[in-house]
C-alpha cells in the first residue's frame, strides 16, 4: 500500500512564505461573459517562473503508435517519460506564464488571499504541519480575493443525449480500418492481449459488468469475437494515451460488419467505465446535428474535495459530457475544496532554505508531505497513462533498501538481516492461513487459442451467455448439446475460467506443508537443543480466542513461539520489529489494530514494475488533471458544513451543499470525496442522516496516520546513490526479549528517504509509522528534531552532522480536512465494507481511496474511485448502454440498404428486391441457367444467381445516376500540423546540429521523433503573432469542411432517393423469380 496524505501549513512564517512563493505564479482574476467572476486556474506547480516550457506540458499530437522507449540514466535511476503528445493549440494558456488562480472566484489553489500580516487563526485551525527555518523568511503580500456567485439551480437532469451505440449507422464505418495490415494476426493479437492487461482487464474473459450487460444479448460462442474487438480498442488507447480513441477507430477493430454492434458496445462500455479516454486528454465534442428549441441547463454535478478522487471524477465527467454532447443542454461540474490548494493528500511543499542547481531553471524544489511513491506503472496502473503518457513528467526509479543501521550506528550484517526477514515472512505467511477467502464468481471466457492467434469464432448455436453459464454452473452443459456436431468440435472454455483478478489462494503452501522448525533450518537457523525438526507453531489459540482477532496478536504469538525454538537475540528482535514497522507504514496503523482475516483484502491487485517518485513534486499530477486539457471549475476555501441530499434518488429533489462561509450550491448530483477520517469525525452534517449500512461501514473500517520529518541540510553526509536506509529502534529496556515492548518505538524514524534525486537538494525524509506516527502529533518540534539529528549523528560518526537548515513535521491526524492518512481494514471490518463505502445513497455518490476495495490506501485507488463515481453518474443521467436487437446479425445477413451508400459500394451482401438483404448461404449453389423454381423463402442454392441479379441491378442504377460521391476527407483542422509543414526544415537543421554537437559526428542526423519534439517546443514558445495565421487558417478550413460535408450529405441523400426509385422500377421490370443472367459472349 501507499501513503496518500497531504497537509496545510502551521505557523505564521510557514504560511507567509508559502504565499510569497506561490504569488510569483499568480495572475489576476478574469470575468466570464455571463458576468460571474471566475478565477483562472493554476497550471502545474513546477511551472518555471521565467515562462519557459514546463516539463508537464506535452508537445504536439502525433499519430497513434507505439510509445517511444524511455530514456533511462542507469547510474541514478532517473527516467524521462515518453514524449507526451497533444494538440498544442488547446494547451498554451494552460501552462505558459505561471500558476494562475484556481476556480470559481474563490481563493487560488496554492495561495490565500489574505495579507500575510493579518490574523491567521482561521487559516491555521485546520492545519497541522510544523515548519521551521534557521533564518527569517522574507514577507510578501498576496493578491486580494475576488467574489463568486452561486452555482445556479439547474432543471431536471436531461437524458436527451443518446448513447454512443444508439441508432448507429454501422455501414458508414469500415471493418478492419484500425487493424494494421502489415502486422501478422498473431503479433496484432499479442499486442491486444498486452493492452488488456495494461488496462486491468483480463484479455480472455469478460469483466463482470460486461457480462451483466451482455449476458442476455450475446451468444456464448461470440465472446471470443467480442474480446478480440475490446482488446483491440484497448490497444489503440495504450499505444498513445494522448489521443482519445474515436468511435470510428473503435469500430474499425471489428473484422466484419457483423461485429459492429459488439464494437459499438465495447467502445461505449470502455469509455463510460474509464478504461480509455481518461486523464488529461482532449475529448472532441460529439458530432450531433443542431437542434431547434430553447436551451436549458444541464445537470449540475458538485464534487466535494479536490484530491485525486475529486479531480479525477470531475475531469472524467467533463470528458463524458463532451462525448455525449447535447446542443440544447449545458451540464456543469463544480469542485469544492476546503483548503487553499488542490491535491488533497498529495502535497509537495516548497523548500525555501536552498536553491537547487540540479533542477530545471525556475523549478522550485519541493518535499512530499503526503503521497510519495508510485507503486509500479505496469499491469494496469492508470497513473502510467497520466504521468508517462500525457504529462510526460520525469520520474526517479527507486532501488530497494540495501543498508539497515543498528542502534550503535553499525550496518547490520546482510546475512543476519536476510535470516530475520525470512523469519518475519514465515510468521506473516502462517498468519495468512486465517485469511478470509473471497468468493470469486467466474465470468464467460473466450477461446484462448483463437484470441492468441487473432481469430474470431463466427458460428452461433443460439445460446446466450447467461444460458450457457447457468448450465455450466449447474453441470448440465452436455444436455444443451445432445448432438455434438452442432458445435463442430469447437470447445468453449468456461469450466476452468480464470477470474479477471488472480484468485486468492486458499492456503499459503509452505506454512502448512512444512513444520516451522524445518522451515527455520532451511532459512539457515540452528534450532535450540531439544527442539525436533517436526516442531511447529500453534497459532490457533490466539487466532480463535476473540471474535475479532488481529494480525498483530497472532504475529506476536508467532515470534514468541519462535523464541522457544531459536536462539534469538535482542538484535534479532530489533530486526524483526523493523519489518513489523514497515508493515505498519503500509497500513498506517499498529498491526495490533488490523483484521487478521482481511487486512490484505486487496491481495492480487498489485501493479508491477519498479517503484518510483515524480521529480519536482507529485503535486504536478493533480495540477495536471485540473488544468489539462481545459481548466476545471474548482472553488477553494469552500469548507462544506452540511449536505442536504435526496436519499431516494428520484431526481425530484435537488441537493444543497452548504459551506461555512454561508454560500450554498444547488446540484443534481453530489460526489463526496473527503477522507474516511472526516466521515468518522462527523465534520459534515448529512440531511437526512446517512443510512445505517453506510454508517456501519464508516465505523468498522479504520483510518490511520503516518507522519514524516523532513530535513534539509547544507551538504549531504550520506551515500547519495542509495534511495533509502533503515534504522533499528530499541525498546525502553534495551535488551528486552518481550515482543510487546518493541511496538511503541519500532516505527520512530525507522526509514529515511534520500530525496536528492527528486528535490535537487540534500533532503532526508524520516518516516514515523505505527504508534510513533501518533506520538508525532503531540511531541514538540524541538524534541523530535533533536532526536532524529542525534540518531543521524550516531550512524554517521565519521562526519560532523550539522543541524538541519530547514525542517518540516507533518501531523496528519490533526488536519481537519483529513483526520489521518489513509484507510485500513480494522479488526471489526467486514469483507464488503469497502463496497458499502462506494455505494451511492440516492443522488449522493462517494469516491476516495477508502471506497476502492481493490486498491485502498493508494493514489491510483483514489483516482480509480473517481472514475467509478463518474461512471455511476453518467449512467444515472443517460441510462444504461443501449444494446441493439439483435446484437449480432445472423451470419450472411447484410446491413439495411437505406442506411448508407457504403453498403451499395461494398456489394458483398447485396440487398434483395424488398429493400433488405437476403442471407447468403455457405452451401453449394447451382451455376447453370436451368436452376429449379425459386421463391424468396428458398435461400439454399441460389447465392450466385442472387449476386448476379444484384450486380445487374446496381449496374443499371450506376448507368443512370453514376456512382455515389465518395465521403469527403476532413483536413487542416490542427494548426500545429500546418505550422509543422513550414518549419520542418528549420527544426530538422537545428536538431541535426545538436545531434552532431553531442555525438561529435559531423554526419549525424536527428531521428524523426526528435524533430517532432523540437517542433512541439518551437510551437509552444512561438508568439501569438506567429501562431495567428495557422489558427486562422484552421478556422477557415473548418468552415470549408462543414460546407463540403453538408453538401455531400445532401447529395448522398438525393442519390439514395433516386437510386431507390430506379431500383424499384428495375425490380418491377425484372422480377427475380423469372430473371436470367445475360448469356456470356
From Swiss-Prot:
This protein's GO CC annotations: nucleus
Domain (SWIRM) ranges: 192-287
Enzyme class: oxidoreductase
EC annotation from Swiss-Prot or TrEMBL: 1.14.99.-
Biological process according to GO: epigenetic regulation of gene expression
Principal cellular location given in the protein's record: nucleus
Biased composition (Low complexity): 66-81, 141-161
Keyword terms: DNA-binding, Nucleus, Oxidoreductase
Subcellular location: Nucleus
Gene disruption phenotype: Does not affect whole genome H3K4 methylation.
Chain positions covered by the region annotation Disordered: 37-173, 902-940
Ranges of Polar residues composition bias in the record: 119-132, 914-925
Function: H3K4 demethylase-like protein. Might not act as a H3K4 demethylase or is not the major H3K4 demethylase since its deletion does not affect whole genome H3K4 methylation.
Protein family membership: Belongs to the flavin monoamine oxidase family.
PANTHER family xref list: FLAVIN MONOAMINE OXIDASE (PTHR10742), LYSINE-SPECIFIC HISTONE DEMETHYLASE 1A (PTHR10742:SF386)
Protein name, UniProt field: Histone demethylase-like protein A
Name of the gene encoding the protein in the UniProt record: hdmA
Amino acid at each position: 500500500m501507499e501513503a496518500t496524505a497531504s497537509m496545510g501549513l502551521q505557523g505564521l512564517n510557514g504560511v507567509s512564505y508559502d504565499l510569497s512563493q506561490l504569488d510569483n505564479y499568480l495572475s489576476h482574476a478574469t470575468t466570464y461573459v455571463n458576468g460571474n467572476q471566475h478565477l483562472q486556474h493554476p497550471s502545474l506547480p513546477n511551472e518555471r517562473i521565467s515562462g519557459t516550457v514546463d516539463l508537464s506540458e506535452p508537445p504536439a499530437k502525433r499519430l497513434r503508435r507505439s510509445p517511444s522507449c524511455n530514456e533511462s540514466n542507469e547510474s541514478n535511476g532517473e527516467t524521462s517519460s515518453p514524449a507526451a503528445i497533444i494538440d498544442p493549440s488547446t494547451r498554451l494558456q494552460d501552462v505558459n506564464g505561471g500558476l494562475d488562480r484556481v476556480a470559481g472566484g474563490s481563493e487560488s489553489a496554492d495561495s490565500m488571499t489574505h495579507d500575510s500580516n493579518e490574523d491567521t487563526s482561521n487559516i491555521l485551525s485546520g492545519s497541522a504541519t510544523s515548519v521551521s527555518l534557521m533564518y527569517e523568511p522574507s514577507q510578501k503580500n498576496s493578491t486580494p480575493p475576488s467574489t463568486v456567485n452561486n452555482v445556479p439551480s439547474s432543471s431536471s437532469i436531461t437524458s436527451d443525449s443518446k448513447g454512443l451505440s444508439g441508432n448507429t449507422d454501422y455501414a458508414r464505418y469500415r471493418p478492419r480500418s484500425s487493424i494494421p495490415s502489415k502486422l501478422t494476426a498473431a503479433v496484432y493479437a499479442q499486442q491486444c492481449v498486452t493492452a488488456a492487461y495494461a488496462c486491468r482487464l483480463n484479455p480472455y474473459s469478460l469483466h463482470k459488468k460486461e457480462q451483466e450487460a451482455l449476458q442476455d444479448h450475446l451468444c456464448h460462442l461470440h465472446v471470443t469475437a467480442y474480446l478480440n474487438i475490446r482488446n483491440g480498442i484497448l490497444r489503440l488507447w495504450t499505444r498513445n494515451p494522448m489521443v482519445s480513441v474515436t468511435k470510428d477507430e473503435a469500430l474499425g477493430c471489428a473484422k466484419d460488419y457483423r461485429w459492429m454492434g459488439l464494437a459499438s458496445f465495447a467502445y461505449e462500455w470502455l469509455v463510460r467505465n474509464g478504461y480509455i479516454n481518461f486523464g488529461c486528454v482532449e475529448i472532441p465534442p460529439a458530432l450531433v446535428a443542431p437542434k431547434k428549441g430553447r436551451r436549458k441547463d444541464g445537470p449540475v454535478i458538485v464534487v466535494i474535495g479536490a484530491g485525486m478522487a475529486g479531480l479525477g471524477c470531475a475531469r472524467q465527467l467533463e470528458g463524458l459530457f463532451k462525448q455525449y454532447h447535447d446542443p440544447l443542454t449545458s451540464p456543469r461540474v463544480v469542485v469544492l475544496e476546503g483548503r487553499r490548494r488542490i491535491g488533497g493528500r498529495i502535497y509537495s511543499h516548497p523548500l525555501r532554505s536552498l536553491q537547487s542547481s540540479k533542477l530545471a531553471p525556475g523549478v522550485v524544489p519541493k518535499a512530499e508531505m503526503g503521497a510519495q511513491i508510485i507503486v509500479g506503472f505496469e499491469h494496469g496502473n492508470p497513473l502510467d497513462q497520466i504521468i508517462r503518457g500525457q504529462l510526460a513528467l520525469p520520474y526517479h526509479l527507486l532501488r530497494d533498501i540495501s543498508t539497515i543501521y543498528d542502534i550503535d550506528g553499525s550496518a547490520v550484517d546482510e546475512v543476519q538481516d536476510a535470516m530475520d526477514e525470512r523469519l518475519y515472512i514465515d510468521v506473516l505467511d502462517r498468519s495468512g492461513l486465517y485469511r478470509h477467502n473471497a468468493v470469486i464468481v467466474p465470468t464467460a471466457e473466450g477461446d484462448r487459442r483463437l484470441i492468441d492467434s487473432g481469430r474470431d469464432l463466427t458460428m452461433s448455436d443460439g445460446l446466450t451467455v447467461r444460458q450457457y453459464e447457468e448450465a455450466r454452473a449447474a453441470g448440465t452443459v452436455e444436455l444443451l448439446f445432445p448432438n455434438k456436431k452442432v458445435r463442430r468440435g469447437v470447445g468453449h472454455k468456461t469450466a476452468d475460467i480464470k477470474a479477471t483478478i488472480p484468485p486468492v489462494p486458499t492456503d499459503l503452501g509452505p506454512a502448512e506443508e512444512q513444520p516451522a522448525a524445518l522451515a527455520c533450518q532451511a532459512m539457515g537457523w540452528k534450532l535450540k537443543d531439544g527442539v525436533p525438526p517436526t516442531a511447529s507453531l500453534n497459532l490457533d489459540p490466539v487466532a480463535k480466542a476473540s471474535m475479532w482477532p488481529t494480525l498483530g496478536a497472532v504475529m506476536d504469538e508467532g515470534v514468541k513461539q519462535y523464541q522457544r525454538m531459536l536462539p534469538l537475540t535482542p538484535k534479532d528482535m530489533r530486526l524483526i520489529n523493523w519489518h513489523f514497522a514497515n508493515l505498519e507504514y503500509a497500513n498506517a496503523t499498529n498491526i495490533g489494530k488490523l483484521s487478521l482475516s482481511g487486512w490484505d483484502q486487496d491481495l492480487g491487485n498489485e501493479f508491477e514494475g519498479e517503484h518510483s517518485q515524480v521529480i519536482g513534486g507529485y503535486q504536478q499530477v493533480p495540477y495536471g488533471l485540473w488544468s489539462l486539457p481545459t481548466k476545471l471549475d474548482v472553488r477553494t476555501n469552500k469548507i462544506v458544513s452540511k449536505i442536504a441530499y435526496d436519499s431516494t434518488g428520484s431526481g425530484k429533489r435537488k441537493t444543497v451543499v452548504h459551506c461555512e462561509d454561508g454560500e450554498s450550491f444547488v446540484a443534481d448530483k453530489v460526489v463526496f470525496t473527503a477522507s474516511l477520517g472526516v466521515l468518522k469525525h462527523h465534520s459534515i452534517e448529512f440531511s437526512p442522516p446517512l443510512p445505517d449500512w453506510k454508517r456501519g461501514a464508516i465505523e468498522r473500517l479504520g483510518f490511520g496516520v503516518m507522519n514524516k520529518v523532513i530535513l534539509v541540510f547544507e551538504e549531504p553526509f550520506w551515500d547519495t546513490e542509495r534511495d533509502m536506509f533503515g534504522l533499528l529502534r530499541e525498546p525502553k529496556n534495551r535488551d528486552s526479549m518481550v515482543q510487546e515492548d518493541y511496538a511503541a518505538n519500532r516505527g520512530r524514524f525507522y526509514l529515511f528517504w534520500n530525496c536528492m534525486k527528486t528535490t535537487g537538494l540534500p533532503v532526508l525524509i524520516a518516516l514515523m509509522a505505527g504508534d510513533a506516527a501518533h506520538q508525532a502529533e503531540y511531541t514538540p518540534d524541538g524534541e523530535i528534531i533533536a532526536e532524529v539529528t542525534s540518531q543521524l549523528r550516531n550512524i554517521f560518526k565519521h562526519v560532523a552532522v550539522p543541524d538541519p537548515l530547514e525542517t518540516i513535521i507533518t501531523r496528519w491526524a490533526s488536519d481537519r480536512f483529513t483526520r489521518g492518512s489513509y484507510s485500513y481494514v480494522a479488526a471489526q471490518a467486514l469483507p464488503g465494507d469497502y463496497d458499502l463505502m462506494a455505494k451511492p445513497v440516492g443522488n449522493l455518490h462517494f469516491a476516495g481511496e477508502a471506497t476502492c476495495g481493490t486498491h485502498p490506501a493508494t493514489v491510483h485507488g483514489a483516482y480509480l474511485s473517481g472514475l467509478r463515481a463518474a461512471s455511476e453518474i453518467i449512467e444515472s443521467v443517460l441510462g444504461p448502454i443501449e444494446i441493439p436487437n439483435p446484437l449480432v446479425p445472423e451470419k450472411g445477413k447484410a446491413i439495411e440498404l437505406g442506411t448508407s451508400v457504403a453498403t451499395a459500394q461494398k456489394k458483398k451482401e447485396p440487398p434483395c428486391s424488398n429493400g433488405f438483404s437476403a442471407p447468403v448461404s455457405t452451401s453449394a449453389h447451382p451455376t447453370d441457367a436451368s436452376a429449379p423454381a425459386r421463391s424468396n423463402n428458398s435461400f439454399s442454392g441460389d447465392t450466385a444467381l442472387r449476386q448476379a441479379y444484384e450486380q445487374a441491378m446496381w449496374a443499371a442504377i450506376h448507368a443512370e445516376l453514376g456512382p455515389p460521391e465518395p465521403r469527403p476527407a476532413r483536413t487542416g483542422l490542427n494548426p500545429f500540423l500546418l505550422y509543422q509543414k513550414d518549419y520542418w526544415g528549420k527544426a530538422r537543421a537545428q536538431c541535426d546540429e545538436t545531434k552532431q554537437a553531442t555525438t561529435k559526428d559531423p554526419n549525424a542526423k536527428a531521428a524523426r521523433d526528435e524533430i517532432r519534439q523540437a517542433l512541439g517546443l518551437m510551437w509552444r514558445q512561438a508568439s501569438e503573432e506567429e501562431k495567428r495565421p495557422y489558427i486562422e487558417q484552421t478556422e477557415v478550413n473548418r468552415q470549408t469542411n462543414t460546407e463540403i460535408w453538408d453538401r455531400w450529405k445532401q447529395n448522398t441523400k438525393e442519390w439514395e432517393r433516386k437510386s431507390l426509385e430506379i431500383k424499384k422500377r428495375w425490380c418491377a421490370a425484372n422480377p427475380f423469380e423469372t430473371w436470367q443472367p445475360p448469356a456470356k459472349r
